[in-house]
Each structure stands twice: as C-alpha cells, then as structure tokens.
Amino acid sequence: MERDFCEIKLDEPLKYHTSFKIGGPARLFVVPNSIEGLICALSHFPDAKILGRGTNILAPDSGVDVVISTVNLNKCFVDDELIVCESGASLFSVCKKASHNSLSGLEFAYGIPGSVGGAIYMNAGAYGGQICDVVAWVEVYDGEKVMTLDRSQLEFSYRKSIFQRTRWMILKAAFKLKKADMNEINNAMEEIMTRRMESQPMDMPSAGSVFKKPGEDFYVARVIEEIGLKGLRVGDAQISTKHAGFIVNLGEARSSDVLKLIEIIRHRVKEHCGIQLQLEVEIW
C-alpha cells in the first residue's frame, strides 16, 4: 500500500482516538489522506474496523487488529444550498460552515460530536432533528465500485441506516439545507449548545448516550435514576451524576468496567419495567 496515500502506525493505543479515552492497541492504525487512499486501504484490509472521530465507540482493552481512520478526510464545500463533505469531516465544523453561509437545517446537530460518516451510519439526532432529515445523497464504496445513493435508498429509521447491515464505506455526503438569516441560525445553535452544556457531562470522557430510546415517552436516564443507579461506579467507569444516560470515564476506566455497568443497567431496567434496552454506543 502506498504510504503517500496513507499514514500507518503500529500498535497505536485506541484510547488516544476515542472520546471515552478507552481502548487497547490497534496492531495497524491506517490513516488515509484522500478518498483514493481510503479505497486503497479498504482493498488491502476489507475487515478493518472503521473509525471516524471515535465518539460513539467502546474499544476493547485487548485492542484490535486493523483500524482505518477517516480523520484526515475532512474536505467540505458549499454548492448553493448543498454542503458536500468527506466522511471524516466533523459534524461540528459542518454546522459552522452551514451557519457561516446562512444555511439552515443542521442547527439540531450542533454539539453532536463525531464525523459526517458516523452521523449518517447512526442516523444521529437530537432536539427534534435527525441526519436523515437533511441528507440529499451519499457516495459509498461497496468493496468493488463507487456508487451514489439518494436518501430514499439509505433505509433510515431511528438510529439506523443501511450501513449497519452492509460493509459499504461512506466516502462523502451532501446535505440539502435552506437559506435563512445567519443570526437566527447562530442563536438557535447557541441555544442548543447551552442546553447540552447544562444537561450533559460534556467535560468528561464518554461516548454519549449509551442506550437508544425505546419509545417516545420512555426516558432512559429518568428510569436509571428512579431505580437508584445514578452515580454507580465500577472501577473508573461511572453512571454520570449529571445525566444518567451517560457513562463517564473518571480517569483510568477500562472497557470491561463499562461493560459491567451496561450489564447492571440493562438487568435492573428489565427487572423494573420489562424493557430490554438496546445499545446506542457501538461495542467493538
């Protein structure tokens, strides 16, 4: 594989590349510098784990074999009311570019950590909006060819997309937005960020919401608090005292600590109200 296309690191600790600050070494950590480099890396390592910004990942303490990181694939440009981005671009930077160009539609996503690719993979959402609301098309690599799919082909639903049942790699995507007043966009974004800061442990290492919401009127954090688990700690992993839907790393948490907390929460919630919680965080 051409090193001009990719940077390659050996035995790279994944804790340096995940928002949880957890994870053992990747035997090979491959960082493509272009879409062509990404396709080249995928052709050499078709079974590699794909890592964007690492904000929704719990990596194992034992590490993994090969990781391909999209962090350097962050080009982004505006074409009238479309924003076209490579898959590694941060959602934060895309929201900022939208506001700077007076484009509305991504306000809900301001403050969601992670990459464009990860957001589409999970159909990320918050505050009444979802990524599927604004996706126009996605360019993907299926292991043999590059193809462009429009929104109707992506099988979006709550925290789901077609990419969770395929090995297709998201290369780039376009978001269809609308012209609006820049000040109104910025005000909406800042209001959402303030709400995040007030309600979520954004100053602590975590992977965001651990569990999917099982129903419109079911609030996971509230139930966890009701059954007395808020603040529960295993090793250096703790159910956040600020928002019980989050597990935070107090310093030296291990993946095994987090998994034990997840098991406790799921068991107690099932016992309390009969609901089997589904994970939103992705466990490698």
Swiss-Prot record:
Molecular function in Gene Ontology = FAD binding; UDP-N-acetylmuramate dehydrogenase activity
Between which residues do disulfide bridges form? Answer: none
Q: Which domain of life is it from?
A: Bacteria
Name a single GO biological process: peptidoglycan biosynthetic process
Instruction: Report the EC number(s), separated by commas if there are several.
Output: 1.3.1.98
Keywords assigned: Cell cycle, Cell division, Cell shape, Cell wall biogenesis/degradation, Cytoplasm, FAD, Flavoprotein, NADP, Oxidoreductase, Peptidoglycan synthesis
Q: List the catalytic residues.
A: R159, S209 (proton donor), E280
Q: Which GO terms describe its cellular component?
A: cytosol
In this chain the FAD-binding PCMH-type domain maps to 21-180
InterPro entries, per the entry: FAD-bd_PCMH (IPR016166), FAD-bd_PCMH-like_sf (IPR036318), FAD-bd_PCMH_sub1 (IPR016167), FAD-bd_PCMH_sub2 (IPR016169), MurB (IPR003170), MurB_C (IPR011601), MurB_C_sf (IPR036635), Oxid_FAD_bind_N (IPR006094)
Pathway field: Cell wall biogenesis; peptidoglycan biosynthesis
Q: Where in the cell is it found?
A: Cytoplasm
UniProt-listed SUPFAM superfamilies: FAD-binding/transporter-associated domain-like, Uridine diphospho-N-Acetylenolpyruvylglucosamine reductase, MurB, C-terminal domain
What protein family is recorded? Belongs to the MurB family.
Function comment: Cell wall formation.
What's the protein name? UDP-N-acetylenolpyruvoylglucosamine reductase
List the source organism: Pseudothermotoga lettingae (strain ATCC BAA-301 / DSM 14385 / NBRC 107922 / TMO)
